[in-house]
Design a protein with these regions (language model features):
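Active-site entrance/lid segments in N-terminal catalytic domains of soluble metabolic enzymes
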Residues: 1-117
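Short N-terminal micro-motifs specific to bacterial/archaeal maturation
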Residues: 48, 68-69, 125-128, 154
Length: 159
């Protein structure tokens, strides 16, 4: 994503809400320094990092007031994220849309393993399309869910 595109998306969002929001930033993007600068300048309150080592940017973002949550696909990545100082973890199973980890672990298998390994806030992602699935993630240790693909058909998804 180009920095100008990111600014445009953030400003569109700010125009319709004053609620807290988060931006997902894959750490392998080119122009990372420029994208991070946009997040700081636009005062993004929550940054979800993924696809890279969270150690690279976590302290920098937290020192500037951002809450940092890292997306992981395994217990070992969850532990590395906590060691890097993130505020929370998204445990993303193989059912998730988009880019997944190399492990082919389902969300419902991954969640209790990660929960036993970390005490930080845990968000479930991947294959959550119903209230029942959301409830199941809570029973397995998640405090929240991240839902994406389920909303693709919504009018708001065209932004």
């Amino acid at each position: 994503m180009h920095p100008e595109t990111l600014v445009n998306h953030i400003q569109k969002l700010k125009a319709v809400t004053n609620k807290p929001f988060g931006v997902n930033l894959p750490l392998l993007y080119p122009e990372m320094e420029l994208l991070i600068d946009v997040l700081i300048r636009e005062q993004v309150p929550i940054v979800f990092t993924s696809a890279g080592n969270p150690r690279l940017w976590t302290s920098f973002l937290k020192d500037r007031g951002c809450t940092v949550i890292h997306v992981v696909s395994s217990v070992s990545f969850a532990l590395k994220a906590i060691e890097a100082g993130v505020d929370g973890v998204v445990a993303e199973g193989f059912e998730a849309g988009g880019h997944n980890g190399r492990e082919e672990t389902t969300t419902m298998t991954l969640l209790p393993l990660v929960r036993k390994s970390i005490s930080a806030p845990l968000i479930a992602a991947g294959g959550i399309a119903t209230g029942e699935a959301m409830l199941a993630t809570f029973a397995l240790g998640a405090e929240a869910v991240q839902v994406g693909s389920r909303f693709v058909a919504s009018l708001e998804a065209s932004c």
